[in-house]
Every structure is written in C-alpha cells, then in structure tokens.
Design a protein with these regions (language model features):
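Bacterial signal peptide processing site
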Residues: 30-32
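Thiol-based oxidoreductase modules, predominantly thioredoxin-like and allied folds used
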Residues: 103-116, 131-140
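Thiol-/selenol-based redox modules, centered on thioredoxin-like
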Residues: 159-203
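Bacterial N-terminal signal peptides that target proteins for export
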Residues: 2-16
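Short, internal strand/loop/helix patches
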Residues: 122-169
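Conserved helix-turn-beta segment immediately C-terminal to the redox Cys motif
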Residues: 68-69, 85-109
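Short active-site neighborhood of thiol/selenol oxidoreductases, capturing the structured segment around
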Residues: 62-86, 90
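C-terminal motif of bacterial Sec signal peptides marking the signal peptidase cleavage site
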Residues: 25-28
Length: 203
C-alpha cells in the first residue's frame, strides 16, 4: 500500500510540473504577441523595402531608418483633409511618446509627383515635424510601389489641367525597429491609439 501511495504521489508531482510548464509556455506566448488596436500584419510578404528620393534629393531605403519605428503614409500636398490630418496626428504621436518619440520616423510618399516638387514637399513637411521626410518617385516607379504596398490612387480631373484631385488609400504602414512591417493603422484611429501601439513595438 505504501508503494502505491508513493507512486501516486510521484505521478501527481509530475502532472503538476507538466501543468505548470504548460501554463508558463502559454503565458510566454501571450506576452510575445501584444494586442494591437491597429491591424496586425506581422509576417506580411509585401512592402518590404523601397527606393525613393526624399525632399532633400537623397535616395532613401527602408534600411536607412534601422533602429526606428517607421510610419509611412501615401498622400499629396493639395489633399484637403485626410493627408494633413494624418500627418498632424503622427506629429502628436511623437509628442505623446516622449523621449521614445525621437525614434519614430514619419515618411510621406506623394501620389502626385506631377505637382509635388521637392521644394513643395519640403515646405509641406515643415508644417508637421522637422524630422519628417517626404518621398517622391517617377510615375512609373510609383505605380510599382503602389502595387507592392497595395495602395490605391487615381487622378480625378478638375476644371483645368492642373486643378485635379487624387483619390487614394487612407492609412499608414508601421514598421518596427528591425524594419519589419507590423501594423496597418486606419485613417481616423487617432494619435493616442497609434502612440499606444508604437509603445508596444518599442518593448
């Protein structure tokens, strides 16, 4: 009888240890995958890099910003609402993050290279944050980039040849400090929501 009790006791200890280990592993897994408010696109096989010229004339790649969280928005300078709102909110995100805000790089890719000259883009970025960069491509490069990023844009004719507007996707792509695409944040989510998500990426 004593032999049976010792075996039962040993089996209970083994079972408890296995349960504790499983719980620890599950806990570890849950900690590795934080709950983002934005759309989690971790592991996406698109939008991995780019080669564009910034408003200072320097050729840029995603790898240039290693160590920073990169937020990319596609828009144009004559956009009346979505674009300035998105860039203003991104500037607010930097403020909300305090010192970590210095490790956030805002990038604005114009979908209107015909009108958005480097000089105009530079002046436009100055309205939001001095560290933000505007990026520009040729119409052919832009078409390929938009396909890779799954971005929609289309010229809408106006009353004159230069008074057209641009329909385009509204949202931002967020990369972690290792240059991996992690999030897509929808337009209108707000600065506080994006700041909280970026804070999780810095952990």
């Amino acid at each position: 009888m004593a032999f049976s009790k010792s075996w039962a006791s040993a089996l209970m200890k083994v079972a408890f240890a296995a349960f504790a280990m499983s719980a620890a592993l599950l806990s570890g897994c849950s900690e590795q995958k934080p709950a983002f408010a934005s759309v989690d696109v971790t592991g996406a096989d698109y939008a991995k890099n780019f080669e564009l010229t910034d408003h200072n004339g320097q050729v840029r790649h995603l790898t240039d910003f290693a160590g920073k969280v990169v937020v990319i928005f596609f828009g144009y300078t004559q956009c009346p609402d979505v674009c300035p709102t998105s860039m203003t909110e991104l500037a607010e995100v930097k403020t909300l993050l305090g010192k970590d805000g210095e490790r956030v790089q805002g990038l604005f890719v114009t979908v209107d290279p015909e009108r958005d000259t480097p000089e105009l883009l530079k002046a436009y970025m100055a309205n939001f944050d001095p560290s933000f960069l505007a990026l520009r491509a040729s119409p052919e490069q832009l078409a390929l980039l938009a396909k890779d990023y799954k971005v929609y844009y289309k010229k809408v004719p106006g009353s004159t040849a230069t008074s057209y507007t641009m329909d385009h996707s509204a949202g931002s792509y967020v990369y972690d400090t290792k240059g991996q695409l992690r999030l897509f944040t929808r337009y209108g989510s707000g600065a506080k929501v994006l700041a909280a998500d970026i804070a999780l990426l810095f952990r």
